[in-house]
Amino acid sequence: LEVFTHPQAGLQKPLLDADTQRALAGELNAPDPGARAVAVSLLGRLGDGVQTDLIVGALQDADWRVRLAALQALIDQGHPEAAGATITMLEDSAPQVRSLAARSISRLGTDYAESLAAILEDPDPGVRAVAATGVGGIRAQKTLDRMLESDSPADQEAALRALASHPDLTELDLVRFAGHPDRRVRAAAAAALAPLAGSGPAIRSLLDDGSVIVRRASAAALAQRADGPALFMDVLANGSVRATEAALQSLADTGQTGEGLTEWASQEVARAAFLRRHRLALATSDSSATRTVLATLLASRQERLLRWALLATTTPHTADMMTVVGRGLRSADQETRAQAVEALESVGVHAVTRSLIPLLEETGHGALPDSRTSLRELSEDHDEWIRALAVRCITEELIDDLGHLRGLADADQSGLVQSAIARWEVIAVQDTQTLDTVDRVVALQRVPMFAGIDPEDLERIATLFTERRYDAGELIFAWGAEGDEMLIIVEGEVTVSRPQEGAEVPIRTVRSGDYVGELSLLRGQPRAADVTAGPEGVRGLILRGAQLHAILEERPEAAMAMLATLAERLGTDWNR
């Protein structure tokens, strides 16, 4: 009743009753600093001002987290004592507390500038940078310029973050920091460049950065600029996958829409339908390892394009609905897909909806082409990896055909048949001695830990491997030996065994498309088993420990897949 009869409309700030206030006051003496910090924070947010003495007392707490919460509580309350207490906290031992105090004072106006001038030489770069923005003028410029010219990435990052909101405090060229080796400095540079004229191309280049935090910072910076929409559209037309992802997410977060964006989304859906059609065509014939990788690539490209199209038509108001629409479009149930299309139509993206129809039909638009026709069309695609895999599939078919011709030449002595075959005798198919880039990527995509990684990224990862061959029966890894290598099996198989009472006890056989030796790498312990090449020998790719750890750190999905395989193997070995 009190809620509905309150004279002031809208949400009301809840007030502490006496019992709750006593409970929170008691928590200020709790042994856990986390509990004390929460208590003082609640007193600041929910209190009516009479708890100020308790909050001021918490500024003397031994734990910096409690002091930080107490200072924030005073600032939020806007209490008359807040300014004096904040100035006192500029001398706190914790940089987090000093930084909050400096930020608060910098908002109070020039009357407090001299208080901040005293900490322009603070040991913490974040505190110095915040103090400089509050002091302003030539002293601030000298402080920030010194930080930018220092060799410390922490100094440079802090100065750049301060300049994002105070670009007038330096005359130095900030574009050079877009190429800094430290990703945090590059991210801060993107924010600092946002308000500067002529910096659009430099910020745009950071959309393709290898670090996700830099890409996000770059997209956020472009979204603030007048030329941001034009630069985003240029990225969608010509940018890399990473740049496109960052641009689309920023457009969705900021709610930017337009006819050009809708047209682009329609084209992406049409492209997805084209890829799906060829994927279905390839599924009608026998599948080699390369065809399997090509089909997987077509499916992942199709999924990516559909996701991009939905993201391009998403606004903050429709984000939740678009998530549901996306699930519906991917459903195996035809009725669910139809309902998803209707939902998409209801938000007014008619061009995208029309483009979706061929993508959702059972066989696309019209009859499917035969697999050879599909491969020929895909061999002329604008996507480099689709072309490469299609050409490799065609090459493999030609090799099979030539093998068939040679068999005919040996079996059929008809002069007419021999004459027909003779023109092909000049073509010699040689067994490649080393694996090329396509071979390596195809081999890696057969391995579960790499199956979810795009060929473009696998192309770089493949350079970390060393190719090796092992003869039949050759010992690859020895029980008890130190191990800093794992083996991806490309051709052949290996036997994993353990010596026991003078004999080798087989544990399992590992075939092509799998790997061995990873456990010793991960644990840093000697080999727990012998690994021996099978009767046909082994062709494989060796990966050293440092490279494996780098891959797992960069690609969490590879780490999860490796853990799943490891758990399965340990379970199998335990049952033995």
Predicted regions and their residues:
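Structural detector for internal amphipathic alpha-helices that build alpha-solenoid repeat scaffolds
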Residues: 1-16, 26, 34-48, 53-57, ...
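Extended repeat-based solenoid scaffolds, especially LRR ectodomains
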Residues: 266-316
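Regulatory nucleotide-sensing modules
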Residues: 438-506, 510, 514-516
